[in-house]
Each structure stands twice: as C-alpha cells, then as structure tokens.
Amino acid sequence: MGTGGAVGVLKASSKKREWFIARVSPNTEKSSRDRLLQMGVEAFVASQEEYRFYKNGDRKKPRKKKVELVVITQYVFIHITEIERRRLVEEPFIRCFLIDRTHEERTFATVSDEKMHQLKLMLGYQDAQVQFAAADYTIGEEVTVKGFGSQEYTGHVVRLRGDKTSYIGVRIDALGCAYLEIAPQRLAKKQ
C-alpha cells in the first residue's frame, strides 16, 4: 500500500545528496535526529546551546547547566538522496517531507549546502539568540556580516517591530527566514 502521494515522483537527480526537510512530532526533533544518526544518516536540528541557572537546594551558588534549545521546531534537516528519502518516509517518527510550494510541479523542499552552512554559522554564534519567523522576508538590502571568524557571511537586513533594530536573515524558501540581531557596526553594505 505505501504512503501514496507522500512518496512523490522520482527525480532524475535521485543520486545527488540534498538537504530535505522532514516534519516530526512536537518535542521529538533531537531524538529523531539521534535515531537518524544511529541509522547512518546525516541529520541536523536547528538548535543553539545556552546556559541555564537553577537553584540548587540549600546551596547559595546556583547550578549552571548547558541546554540545547531547538530554534526551528518540528523539523529535521536530512542530507540524503531521493531514493533514501523514499525509504525514510516509511519511518514512524517522520511525519512527512515538506513540499516546495514555489514550484507548480509537486517537488519536495530542499535547502542548498550554502544555506545550510550559513544557518549552522548563525546557530553557532553565541553572542545572540537566533530566532525563526515563518514569514516571507524579501525586503531589505544585502549585507556582509563581520565577526563570524574567517568566514564571510552574507544575508539581508530585515526590520522587525521598529526601525532601530537591525536583523540579519538567512532565507530558507520552504520554511521562512532565520534571523539574528546584529549590532549595526558589524554590518557592511554588499558591494
């Protein structure tokens, strides 16, 4: 019987590895990623590490604990071929794969290696918390961000809740825009 239309049409580029976006149940992103990794499949959850402080009983000094916070909930990025995707859609912890609604034909949403690299860079930046908006941010000018190590990072400035705060965004067409608050002195106009 199978999954019917969820399997989709086999593309000519079925042997090329791409970043597909799988939808999983709420609060299972990390465990789904771990299961995929145990299966030998490259998987990524958009998350950031943060330190939390907890009261520790009678002690005066609070306990510090590092936690992994999921930024894009209910989604796991999986680096696989089309043939592998057809096998994984049968796994019980994967609800479905996202459809790319920007095309007329029914294709599955994929993220380029470059966009995934940029998203990982943003999530690795510890000075600010990355937020994710499932909205269409296409306005703003293209900028280069200084301070991501030796890597040059390019994105677009978006305005959110006021004109005085600058945000840098990475556009993932199927999901929206991941954005990070950046100090204006760290931005340079793209030439």
Regions found by a protein language model. Name each.
Residues G2-E142, V158-Y167, R171-Q191:
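Acidic-enriched and Gly/Ser
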Residues F148-G149:
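Short, surface-exposed secondary-structure boundary micro-motifs
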Residues E152:
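Beta-strand residues that line the small-molecule/cofactor-binding core
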